[in-house]
Amino acid sequence: MAQDSKILEELYTVIASRKGTDPDKSYTAKLFARGRGKIAQKFGEEAVETVVAALSEGKDELVGESADTLYHLLVLWADCGVEPAKVWAELARRTGTSGIDEKKSRAKK
């Protein structure tokens, strides 16, 4: 795998390829087999662990937890059929817009 910004796309491709494969041979396949609720739960758990690492642990722990969080986010995207390019396009659309202005522009629910 690449050591640059393409790593997320490459990892996403590997993750997506695990969908429907033997859950006894792949942690990713096991997550897919357990369903979206479990995938979302794991993402949430990793996000919390990342916050804890940022607040009370060292940089190495934060890096590790961040990698876990990104991995589980990619699994969630793959399960939902969201490709990274869609997220990158949304980020690009928001580039150059203040966060305050961008938030105001969203439709109220």
UniProtKB/Swiss-Prot annotation:
<keyword id="KW-0547">Nucleotide-binding</keyword>
<dbReference type="GO" id="GO:0005524">
    <property type="term" value="F:ATP binding"/>
</dbReference>
<comment type="pathway">
    <text>Amino-acid biosynthesis; L-histidine biosynthesis; L-histidine from 5-phospho-alpha-D-ribose 1-diphosphate: step 2/9.</text>
</comment>
<dbReference type="GO" id="GO:0005737">
    <property type="term" value="C:cytoplasm"/>
</dbReference>
<dbReference type="GO" id="GO:0000105">
    <property type="term" value="P:L-histidine biosynthetic process"/>
</dbReference>
<dbReference type="Pfam" id="PF01503">
    <property type="entry name" value="PRA-PH"/>
</dbReference>
<keyword id="KW-0028">Amino-acid biosynthesis</keyword>
<keyword id="KW-0067">ATP-binding</keyword>
<keyword id="KW-0378">Hydrolase</keyword>
<comment type="similarity">
    <text>Belongs to the PRA-PH family.</text>
</comment>
<protein>
    <recommendedName>
        <fullName>Phosphoribosyl-ATP pyrophosphatase</fullName>
        <ecNumber>3.6.1.31</ecNumber>
    </recommendedName>
</protein>
<dbReference type="InterPro" id="IPR021130">
    <property type="entry name" value="PRib-ATP_PPHydrolase-like"/>
</dbReference>
<dbReference type="GO" id="GO:0004636">
    <property type="term" value="F:phosphoribosyl-ATP diphosphatase activity"/>
</dbReference>
<keyword id="KW-0368">Histidine biosynthesis</keyword>
<keyword id="KW-0963">Cytoplasm</keyword>
<dbReference type="InterPro" id="IPR008179">
    <property type="entry name" value="HisE"/>
</dbReference>
